[in-house]
Amino acid sequence: MAEEIQTLTIESEDESDELEVSTALIDLLAEEGETTPEVVGDVAMFGLAGRIHAAVHHAQGEPDPELEAAEEATMELFEERFGMTYGEATGHQH
C-alpha cells in the first residue's frame, strides 16, 4: 500500500513553494487537535531557530550584528509560538 502524502503550499508576498509530506509523519508529530499546517509550521520554526542559534553561538569567530538581531527576533517569535524559550524547549541553554 502506498504511503499517503499531503501537499502543502508555503506562500510569501511574491513567491510560493509546494512541500509534500507524509501523512503518517504528520500524525506522529501532531498534538491533539493540531492541523497539518500547524505541525509543519512548528517544525519549520524549530528548524529555523536551531539554524540561527547555531550560526550565532556555535560558529567560528564573532557573529555579525545583523545575524544577532535576526536571532533575537527569531527567538522572540519562537517564544510567542510555543510559550517557552528555545532553551526551555530544547534543554540547550547558554
Task: For the regions a language model picked out, list residue spans one by one.
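Acidic, polar-rich N-terminal leader regions of halophilic archaeal proteins
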Residues: M1-H94
